[in-house]
């Protein structure tokens, strides 16, 4: 009888643990609810594709260095500052962060990461990692946005005012990019020596104007990883992952909502960060 009681106690504890890992319905206060629907803007690359999205949550800000350190225990960023966006993170780093944060917050991880099996779909000759990453359908944990979700949120969702950039037609109101991310404004054509001499760098999140949904920095500051492969008729399939929004070193056109950004999944750009999403 005693053995059965011990067994039942262990089973009950295991059951509670399983529930705590996947049954947490609390939503972090740094997430914004995005009401789903069809695109209201004409400035998205998905505007004419009859895409309809479900409700989801997205980070009000890019993932900060403090948020990254609290979960991962290190800080790969070149421009240090707790409230600056984390940068120099690969797509694989971003996937691992999503799962680790999910576990930390007692959510079910959205991804299964197989580091021993080379992804057969990955055609990028420069990618020396090529982990196989699959989705756990129905999981409530953190994840990267799809390209469509990213552009939908950046354009203001159902509240869109049809801006070119996320929250404005004037990039200087909403974006940190090569002309305004340094000690003084720059003019003329994109120029790396001028950028370097001007001490351009990332800025603490949330300093520019928010977009229609109250989301900050979806244009500029750092580029943001998305989940799927970049797809374009003039580029090879399954080679780059989508990277959106442009960054502090980028030309202004990359900050446009529709700009088709891409990057090697193992790339460590000084303007490459992320923003998280959760399904509703």
UniProtKB/Swiss-Prot annotation:
UniProt xrefs under PROSITE patterns: PROKAR_LIPOPROTEIN
Name the GO terms of the biological process aspect: protein folding
> Where's it found, cell-wise?
Cell membrane
Q: Where is the lipid attached (N-palmitoyl cysteine)?
A: 19
Q: What's the chief localization of this chain?
A: membrane
UniProt keyword list: Cell membrane, Chaperone, Lipoprotein, Membrane, Palmitate, Signal
Query: Residues of the signal sequence?
Result: 1-18
InterPro entries from the UniProt entry: CTDL_fold, Sulfatase_Mod_Factor_Kinase, SUMF_dom, SUMF_sf
| Alphabetical list of Pfam families matching this protein | FGE-sulfatase
Q: How does it sit in the membrane?
A: Lipid-anchor
Q: What top-level branch of life does the organism fall under?
A: Bacteria
- Lipidation, S-diacylglycerol cysteine type: 19
A Gene Ontology molecular function term for this protein is: formylglycine-generating oxidase activity
Q: Which GO terms describe its cellular component?
A: plasma membrane
As for what it does, the entry says: Is required for the expression of the adjacently encoded xylanase Xyn11E in an active form. LppX seems to act as a specific chaperone necessary for the correct folding of the xylanase during secretion across the cytoplasmic membrane.
Name assigned to this protein: Chaperone protein LppX
| Native organism | Paenibacillus barcinonensis
